Amino acid sequence: MGLILAGASEYILRTKIAPQDEFIAHVNLFNSDPVSDAAFGDSHVARGFVPPQGMLNHAYPSESIPRMAWKVDAYFSDHAPDRVIIQADPHMFAPYRLSKTVGDYPAQFENPTHSKFGLYLSIPRYRANLVNYWASFARNGGQLKSEITFTSGGAHLSPGDISKEPPRYRENAALTRARIHDLGPASTQKAYREIYSKMLTDLNRKGANICMVTFPVSPNFRTAIRTINDAERKGIFAFFEQEAQRIEARYVNWEAITDDLSNFRDTDHLNGDAAKHFSPQLVTECFG
């Protein structure tokens, strides 16, 4: 029985998952001909920013500060940066993010489909999501179709409209997410603040025109997170402002840019239509 399940899982990974794997597309774009204008961060940037012609979005969901810093350094190792958007969101310093080191990230960017004995089941990111794949496979009648659109500029655009959900659902979802994003004391953030600062310093020394951006979240999420730990969040926002002043960068706080729930796919991410709508305005706000 175990061998049958393993064989079926390997088949699904090869025929359904790998052909539409966003990470492979993301790595291929990262390793393509480099440009001087780019954006970096996690899913808030990946799903919420559609870059203009000539700029690429190199953000990837759940990316930690050490991995983002490695990526920025690697990308601009052999060419000069120009306009660079760097995510500046408080949740990047939440405890659940403070254990994610660089690890094998560089190796994944060299070969995103590296596997043992040629088995896709041996690829960690696939193995970690295997239960979710099977659940989705069963729920959708044997079909596995990603709803994410990976654009030529690197954005990972998502459908969804949280305004269609009942108010109680939105409030509970926001509170659950806010608890995950709750910040610990500043002392626990020290090492990651230093990594973040060094990333900005290195970019600044290379002549980058840096814009630090706090990305939009829904009004439900803003309310929920303030009730949990407003003081620590204010400390992070002060840190972002101080860093921007230190390197003479632009800091744009767009956390509350919109109260229209139809702009959000879930409680703290813009949907694809909103990303397309707001991105040109953000570029103007950042760089004129």
Annotate each predicted stretch with a short phrase.
Residues H44-N129:
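Membrane-embedded segments
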Residues M1-Y11:
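Hydrophobic membrane-insertion alpha-helices, especially the h-region
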